[in-house]
């Protein structure tokens, strides 16, 4: 009789990967990265264990939005005070903080739980082509 095996967090070996976001479409890249951060690409995926990889994204300011989303996609923030709703377009978000578009898209695709918080900490996004994680020898990863 076969038994289902579950991976323990001590058995997980996290790998480092670097992704160049230049000329990549925001939603497709975000979905790919979110899946990698959760570890869903592994055949022994266990939903209650942080088994995802560590992902470094460079050139986040050069990400693409399709159609007219640059001006029509809206991001909402609320301060918690009456009348404190702030609405910004994707163009305004990119001008103010270029990595916010990508981080927010990826964070929205990861569960909002304690485990999701751990998985979000494995994401490193940089607006330029340089990153400080050369000591980890990250492998280059191509998005499909």
Curated annotation (Swiss-Prot):
A Pfam family recorded for this sequence: Ribosomal_L13
Keywords in alphabetical order: Ribonucleoprotein, Ribosomal protein
Cellular component terms per the entry's GO annotation: cytosolic large ribosomal subunit
GO molecular function, a single term: mRNA binding
Highest taxon, organism lineage: Bacteria
InterPro entries noted in UniProt: Ribosomal_uL13, Ribosomal_uL13_bac-type, Ribosomal_uL13_sf
GO BP, sorted A to Z: negative regulation of translation; translation
Keyword set includes Amino-acid biosynthesis: no
Family recorded in the similarity comment: Belongs to the universal ribosomal protein uL13 family.
Record function comment: This protein is one of the early assembly proteins of the 50S ribosomal subunit, although it is not seen to bind rRNA by itself. It is important during the early stages of 50S assembly.
PANTHER family, alphabetized: LARGE RIBOSOMAL SUBUNIT PROTEIN UL13M, RIBOSOMAL PROTEIN L13
Record-given protein name: Large ribosomal subunit protein uL13
Protein's organism: Mesomycoplasma hyopneumoniae (strain 232)
Lineage of origin: Bacteria, Bacillati, Mycoplasmatota, Mycoplasmoidales, Metamycoplasmataceae
Underlying gene: rplM
């Amino acid at each position: 009789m076969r038994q289902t095996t579950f991976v323990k967090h001590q058995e997980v070996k996290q790998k480092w990967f670097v992704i160049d976001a230049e000329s990549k479409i925001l939603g497709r890249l975000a979905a790919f990265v979110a899946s990698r951060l959760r570890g869903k690409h592994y055949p022994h995926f266990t939903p209650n264990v942080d088994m995802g990889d560590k992902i470094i994204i460079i050139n986040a300011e050069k990400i693409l939005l399709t159609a007219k989303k640059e001006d029509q996609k809206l991001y909402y923030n609320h301060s918690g005070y009456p009348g404190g709703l702030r609405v910004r377009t994707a163009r305004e978000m990119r001008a103010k903080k270029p990595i916010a578009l990508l981080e927010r898209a990826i964070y929205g695709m990861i569960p909002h739980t304690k485990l999701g918080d751990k998985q979000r900490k494995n994401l490193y996004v940089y607006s330029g082509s340089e990153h400080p994680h050369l000591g980890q020898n990250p492998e280059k990863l191509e998005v499909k």
